[in-house]
Amino acid sequence: MVLALLLLPATLSYAKPYELRMLNHWDNLDGTIERGYAGRSIFWPKLQRDKIEEYARYNEQLGINAIVPNNVNASPKMMTDEILQQTKELADMLRPHGIKVYLAINFGSPKALGFCETADPLEPAVAQWWVERCKRIYQLIPDFGGFLVKANSEGQPGPLDYQRTHADGANMLARALKPYGGQVIWRAFVYSPSDPDRAKQAYLEFQPLDGQFDDNVIIQIKNGPIDFQPREPFSPLFAAMPNTKMLAELQITQEYLGHSMHTAFLAPMWTEFLADVNKVAKCKLVGLAGVSNVGDGSQAGNAPTVLNAPGVQSPLFTLCGNHVAEANWYAFGRLCKNPGLKAEAIAKDWANIFFNEQQQMMDSQQRRGNTQKPENSLTTLLPRKDAVKVLTSMLMRSREAVVDYMMPLGLHHLFAWGHHYGPEPYCAQPGARADWMPTYYHRADAEGLGFNRSSHGGTDATHQYPAKYAAMLDDMKTCSYQYLLWFHHVGWGEQIRHKVGGRAYEESLWLALCRHYQHGVDEVAEMQKEWQKLEGNIQPAIFNDMTKRLECQYRDAEWWRNGCLLYFQTFSKLDLPQFVPSISHSLDFYKSVNLGLTNYECPTIQLLDEKR
């Protein structure tokens, strides 16, 4: 872990820090972490005090000032005295570091815990129960931040169960918190299985409620209208609720970008989003909430075992699943404090800090006589300036590489069922909701590919955006190629203009699709080459671990390219171009791959080698 942070002057531009700079943890009371790829919870079932102290110091230096330590799919037990007492102990640990604790709550808690016959927010007994709970919480935690609520989404209870609105539910809680200065953060991640376009749902449910929320209610909105895809347009809600406080939810953990196995530096995604929110939506956010990638470091099977003397921490230990993934935690914190930073400047700063840490750790090992030489005896130490340049380049190309080999040109939701690791554009789960299936999103057929969200025979999702931006998106000729298949169903032979690796092309959709998938694979190969240049600058254990992860990422990129192109080829009936290498496996082989993972783990390299 990087603890001696040096927040270097990355750029002369400066923007005012966000008021609320929050991490959301999807940690469960049993210690599992939903979409967690770095081990088990440091908060539950018991407080891991040494790791929490390390976590708190790091957050303090980044400027994080609030956390939610539990899953938004919250247990009603969060409101029991036992859990509140443990939360008090956590708050006591974080307070010296300037960090407030909020709790995610289950809206149905008064009913689920047996205190009320209903959870109707307009029922006086329900409102009074929350008043009494808030009174107890603030007796224990005087600076308690408030509640985070996921309601009427993916099976969670909420006010709509009682024919009430989101505003009714949020305001009832807000009034219970109001005397103590507490806030309600109400998530806008909602979607109905019956609507023809999931991307429109949050707007349809929340935009009519603009101005109806109390002043201590904040609406937390995911950056895009679906769910943390490698690339999404910004959610139209950011441009549609001028009388409501809004918080942007970003995902630091890589649920859809290769878990802790793939290198994907997310600052370019976030700065792209913030630029659109500022310039197009003209929205002033209250803050940022990042879905954290922190665990206790116990994620098994991905890294070689390292034996250490008693009291000496393994060089492979990290709270983030792998050492390079720490860059995303760092980038999130930097953007919270200064939203005007450029992604490349953040990458450069983190690379400097990373190499400082590596040098300190190697010096410490040398003093103890515990030096491990690089496997290649000819390895040389790059000058610091050159090493930083190489790592910065690798980070900056990584996210776009992931977009290209997973879901280019605006494709989305092509991942595997359940655990979301690997490609499954052909996924078909009997009895499952249509909007959980990739076919709902890619709409591949003999004519073409993509979801028609235009006003020309589509769902007209484009017109949820501001007028000029909507007009640009609505026209296939002016819509950015990066969002083309998000908003349009495009013919396989239709000529499109796009860019790959900075070079412009005008060619058929099929050729463009193939070119992006191949470019993504090629970019991972370049990332591997860049990493190899750094061998002498990095502890051997960490260098070798990341080398193996990058090898795995390359094979995964090929898996994505092969599975997706073979599948889409069944519709296009077109040959693969010469720049795509021959694919040795059949589509049936890729359809047969089943990793058997849960939502709480990252696949091991061994498992991936066996299965794909």
List where the protein language model places each region:
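Short, basic, low-complexity termini and linkers enriched in Ser/Thr/Gly/Pro
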Residues: 3, 8-10, 358-381
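Catalytic-core regions of glycoside hydrolase
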Residues: 42, 81, 89, 115-348
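Mature, folded catalytic cores of secreted/periplasmic enzymes
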Residues: 62, 92, 96, 109, ...
